[in-house]
UniProtKB/Swiss-Prot annotation:
Keywords: Chromatin regulator, Chromosome, Metal-binding, Nucleus, Phosphoprotein, Transcription, Transcription regulation, Transferase, Ubl conjugation pathway, Zinc, Zinc-finger. Residues 643-668, 723-744, 841-858 have a biased composition (Low complexity). It comes from Drosophila melanogaster (Fruit fly). Interacts with hairy/hry, p53 and Top1. Interacts with the gypsy chromatin insulator complex, composed of Cp190, mod(mdg4) and su(Hw); interacts directly with mod(mdg4) and su(Hw). Interacts with Lam/lamin. Residues 792-801 have a biased composition (Basic and acidic residues). The modification Phosphothreonine is found at residue 820. Functions as a ubiquitin-protein E3 ligase. Negatively regulates the transcriptional repressor hairy/hry by promoting its ubiquitination and subsequent degradation. Also directs the nuclear organization of the gypsy chromatin insulator. Chromatin insulators are regulatory elements which establish independent domains of transcriptional activity within eukaryotic genomes. Insulators have two defining properties; they can block the communication between an enhancer and a promoter when placed between them, and can also buffer transgenes from position effect variegation (PEV). Residues 53-96, 627-858, 972-1038 are annotated as: Disordered. This is E3 ubiquitin-protein ligase Topors. It is found in: Nucleus; Chromosome. Residues 633-642, 686-699 have a biased composition (Basic residues). CDD domains: RING-HC_Topors. The lineage of its organism: Eukaryota, Metazoa, Ecdysozoa, Arthropoda, Hexapoda.
Length: 1038
């Protein structure tokens, strides 16, 4: 179908050069079969006229086609719209290269044709089939609607419309929008994208008698129709009657005028690689003055466009800009207020354009290549949120929104009559602009002329959401209020673009537009409308923010232990540490010990009380800490006593010792005693180092060794006594007295000791003349033992603690054994039974030791027993005193002498041959026992040695036979307690030493300790050790 084009849109375009006009042809479809008023093709299209004159489709005459090679080669590689060289007047030009082939079939073009959007040539048949699939140029990808073929002259050609299958929308040419992209070769603006409203163009074309495009053609390809040509024609027609346009200096300034006049808003331009924006703050410009020089050319170009007819000087505004940029933020109210006197209503638009250029990574030329614009409608109600952002940042409680009505007369002041917009518009446009915001929102508004529900704006930021209530009151004229409801939706079409939103409605249809707009807070806008008439729409925004304590908390914690639903966690945690600190400072150790009883109580009804029950771990740790402190205090006190006792014993004058105790058997010679004391003084140092090495071993191994050693000590104890007595050439102990006097208790103990050792009881004492006195003393001691035992059993009292402390000048005798600390009392039942069994197993040995001590004392004393005659009247009220006072005095004295010997083995010098030592000890006893019972109780509290309350079977037999009880097993109990004290103090002291010593020394000591332990085990077998740590106690060599 052949059609003729009557349009001539480019006929009245001013001359801009052959290259520009040759590519600016827009071929519009004309009426069918009409040649009147047809549009003239550009001069470059004359080549197609010469080529297709014959109308042949065979392509035989292609060799004679006068085609210029330059444009064809350029078109073959896809360069759109390059102009061809002008044909000569005779129309014959020789070509230097063959014509290009068809890009579709790759062969010679048959019946050449081209599209209405570009001048690329193809086969007519190939391009028709290609358009059925996709109406785009195969080379430059520009969409087209018609195919131009069979060109005879510039005004005589055929057109083939492209077929389309898209649905036909409702015809509304006054509301059409299309996207226009400008080609790269254009010197005006390169690769700029705009959204143009062609309402005015369509009306102007209809008024001029031109045909309006059908809706089907718009749907087919009008939305992207001709990247540059429709816009360029519109631009030239827009300023064709403007005298300033010809003297504007450059097309760039003309374009900037068009941007401001047509309300085109630039979209943000970021770095294509990183997506970041350039810094644009006032501080940045103060620190980098060179960045201001980058902005000045762009500012100067726009200021000249805006102030071309104004009385203000461009230099004045440029000076003001250089002062404001380093001092004031671009989006601040101060910057806007200083520019308003010069730029007037276009101040906000200028700030928007300057802001986008300032944060773009390009200079002025690069920015013009890549920037894209978004259009606004001419008549609109503009809600500018720029001030709201600044005010919100400075004052969080006040939100100010500037609302202004754009004046249609001012907008259309520079319009030519051909491009004048319609005078009456049934729709209302709402534009929300906020280029500095970063979050989106949506608005939905409906109005029917009465009370309206309002506009809802909701926005949620990445940090958190905030609710703002804004009341919007709008008064409209009655004519506007009578229209149908309209819906305006402001959505986040492109949040990063800071795009504006436009919603345009006609009287019958409702439409929605989407773009990027943002709010710094979540807002709720209520719209109130009244029918009162007015010249302008008035919008009043009122902000209402709830105080912080009335807002919904971001985090709510629920506690199951509390009766209330909401628990304020912060208040709880602040109160709990104060309560704990107060309890620690006010409670005594007894209160802390009794505090464990209420640790595991049920959940409380209050949150604070429920949290206190969780402090039981702290209470337990506090209790353990107090126990450790008490243990350390007791150990230190015992260490101080032990350190003072050797000092006192060194001042003694007796060089020899002939007595024997349950701990050691020493020889009677002075040399043996001095050697034993010397060797006894060395092992403690060696043993302390050995103990540190042994602590590295596991406890299981040490416990097993202790058990085996205890058993060996029990089994071989009696055998060692017998072997030692036989093997020794010299007597190791003094025999007991065998006098005929009634000393039944002492004879019985002597008999027991002889039976246990397997030897007959013989007397080798040289002082046999004093045996009678010795027997009397022994009888008194036995009576005292029986009395004490009976009293402890009847009254069920705690064992009495006894310890004798002699004056420094009265103590004598060398140190024969290593001192051991006294342990804490062990109240566990499992531990008391074995101790008592050991005490009973060695009762014979204790009796023998007591007999030896008594006989030694009787032998060494040359004075009568009247030296014990200290005042007994002071003890008449004592419950332990029984029988005749005189005999009880002697019994108590002798018994305490024996007890002091057994509990303090270092003071063995009390029972030697020297008479002076015995007399001094008697004097000390008289001074000690003359005190009141309260003094004795106080001494018992400080000393920690107790009698054994278990009944002695041998003592019960003696009590039946002689009415006097045998000796109380004080020796075994004291040994056990001393051993326990030794174990406890040694372990705790070793733990402290272990932390101080280095790891390398411990490894070396382990190897040495292994060898020393083997030697020590042999020595331990010869010793009489009844303690759990008996392997650590020094032994005397035999």
């Amino acid at each position: 179908m052949a059609e003729e084009n009557p349009g001539a849109l480019a006929a009245n375009v001013p001359y801009l050069g052959v290259d520009e006009l040759g590519a600016s042809v827009i071929v519009e479809p004309g009426l069918e079969g009409s040649n009147a008023g047809g549009r003239t093709l550009p001069a470059a299209a004359i080549k197609f006229a010469d080529l297709t004159e014959s109308g042949s489709e065979s392509g035989d005459n292609e060799a004679e086609e006068p085609v210029s090679a330059g444009p064809d080669n350029a078109n073959a590689i896809g360069e759109p719209g390059t102009s061809a060289s002008a044909a000569e007047e005779n129309g014959t030009v020789e070509r230097n290269s063959p014509p290009p082939n068809c890009a579709i079939c790759l062969s010679r073009c048959r019946r050449k044709c081209f599209t209405d959007s570009c001048m690329h040539q193809f086969c007519f048949k190939c391009l028709c089939e290609w358009s059925k699939i996709k109406p785009e140029c195969p080379l430059c990808k520009q969409p087209f609607r018609t195919i131009i073929h069979n060109v005879r002259t510039l005004d005589d050609y055929d057109r083939y419309p492209v077929q389309t299958t898209s649905p036909v929308p409702t015809e509304n040419p006054s509301l059409r929008y299309h996207i226009v992209r400008r080609p790269r070769y254009t010197p005006l603006v390169q690769n700029q994208a705009v959204i143009v409203n062609d309402i005015e163009a369509a009306i102007a074309a209809g008024a001029a008698g031109e045909d309006v495009l059908s809706a089907a053609e718009v749907a087919a390809g009008r939305r992207s129709y001709s990247r540059f040509e429709p816009y360029r024609s519109e631009l030239m027609n827009y300023y064709q009657h403007d005298q300033d346009a010809s003297t504007s200096g450059s097309l760039s300034q003309l374009w900037r005028r068009y941007v401001y006049d047509r309300k085109l808003y630039a979209l943000p331009v970021s770095d294509s690689v990183t997506g970041h924006f350039r810094e644009w703050s006032a501080r940045f410009y103060r620190n980098n003055p060179a960045q201001i020089h980058r902005l000045m050319p762009w500012i100067h170009r726009d200021i000249m466009c805006l102030l071309r007819n104004a009385a203000h000087s461009v230099n004045t505004v440029m000076t003001l800009m250089s002062d404001l940029l380093p001092m004031t933020s671009l989006l601040g109210p101060t910057f806007r207020r200083r520019l308003s006197p010069y730029l007037g209503e276009r101040t906000s638009h200028f700030i928007h354009e300057l802001f986008n250029f300032a944060r773009s990574p390009y200079d002025i030329n690069g920015y013009d290549h890549v920037v894209q614009y978004s259009a606004r409608v001419a008549e609109e109600v503009e809600v500018d949120l720029l001030d709201m952002v600044e005010t919100q940042s400075s004052n969080g409680d006040d939100l100010n929104l500037e609302v202004g009505d754009s004046d249609a007369d001012a907008i259309n002041a520079g319009f030519s009559p051909d491009w004048s917009p319609p005078r009456v518009r049934p729709s209302t446009s709402v534009i929300v602009t906020n280029p500095g915001a970063t979050h989106s929102f949506s608005v939905t508004m409906a109005s029917d002329g009465s009370e309206l529900p309002g506009i809802s704006i909701r926005r949620t930021t990445n940090v958190g959401s905030q609710t703002v209530a804004i009341n919007l009151s709008m008064r409209r004229p009655a004519a506007v209020a009578s229209e149908e409801p309209e819906v305006i939706e402001i959505d986040d079409g492109d949040a990063a673009a800071n795009a504006e939103v436009a919603a345009i409605n006609d009287g019958s249809n409702t439409s929605r537009r989407h773009a990027g707009a943002t709010l710094p807070v979540t807002a709720h806008i209520e719209l109130e409308s009244s029918s009162s008439s007015g010249d302008e729409d008035e919008c009043v925004f009122v902000l209402e923010l709830k105080p912080p304590h009335m807002r919904t908390p971001e985090q709510v914690s629920l506690d199951s232990n509390s009766d209330s639903d909401v628990v304020f966690v912060n208040e709880q945690h602040e109160a709990a540490p104060d309560a704990i600190a107060e309890n620690r400072s006010t409670q005594s150790p007894l209160d802390l010990a009794s505090r464990d009883q209420g640790l595991f109580m049920g959940p409380s009804t209050s949150g604070a009380a429920a949290n206190r029950g969780k402090n039981w771990k702290l209470v337990m740790a506090q209790t353990r800490r107090l126990d450790q402190l008490r243990t350390l205090r007791s150990i230190r006190s015992k260490k101080s006593r032990r350190s003072s006792m050797p000092a006192r014993s060194d001042s003694g004058s007796s060089p020899s010792s002939c007595s024997s105790s349950s701990f050691h058997f020493s020889s009677s010679s002075d040399e043996d005693s001095s050697d034993s004391s010397t060797t006894n003084s060395e092992p403690p140092k060696k043993k302390s180092r050995k103990r540190v090495a042994n602590n590295k071993r596991s406890k299981k191994e040490s416990i097993g060794k202790r058990t085996s050693r205890k058993r060996k000590a029990k089994d071989q104890n009696m055998e060692m006594l017998e072997q030692q007595q036989i093997s020794q050439k010299k007597p190791q102990r003094q025999p007991e007295s065998s006098s005929d006097s009634p000393s039944s208790s002492d004879d019985e103990s002597g008999g027991d000791s002889s039976e246990s050792s397997g030897q007959p009881n013989t007397n080798n004492n040289k002082s046999s003349s004093d045996s009678d006195d010795d027997s009397a003393v022994n009888m008194q001691l036995s009576a005292l033992r029986a009395t004490l035992k009976a009293e402890a059993t009847l009254e069920d009292r705690k064992p009495v603690k006894l310890e004798l402390q002699l004056p420094d000048d009265d103590q004598a005798g060398p140190l024969h054994s290593r001192m051991t600390p006294s342990p804490r009392e062990d109240n566990e039942p499992g531990c008391s039974a074995p101790k008592r069994r050991r005490s009973c197993s060695h009762s014979n040995q204790s009796s023998q030791s007591a007999s030896l001590a008594s006989s030694s004392t009787a032998t060494s004393s040359s004075a009568p027993l009247s030296s014990f005659a200290w005042g007994a009247a002071g003890f008449s009220g004592d419950p332990l005193m029984r029988g005749h006072p005189a005999m009880e005095e002697h019994d108590i004295a002798n018994s305490l002498i024996e007890l002091s010997t057994l509990t303090q083995p270092v003071n063995i010098g009390l029972f030697n041959e020297h008479y002076n030592s015995a007399e001094n000890s008697m004097g000390m006893l008289s001074n000690t026992l003359c005190d009141s019972p309260q003094t004795l109780a106080a001494d018992d509290a400080n000393l920690e040695n107790y009698f054994d309350t278990d009944a002695d079977p041998e003592a019960s037999r003696e009590r039946d036979a002689y009415s006097l009880e045998a000796a109380i097993d004080v020796v075994g109990e004291s040994e056990l307690q001393i051993a326990e004290d030794t174990a406890t103090a040694t372990e705790e002291q070793d733990e402290e030493d272990e932390e101080d010593e280095d790891q390398e020394e411990d490894d070396q000591e382990e190897e040495k300790a292994a060898e020393e332990e083997e030697e020590e085990e042999e020595d331990d077998d010869d010793s009489d050790n009844h303690d759990e740590n008996d392997e650590n106690q020094g032994l005397l060599p035999y």
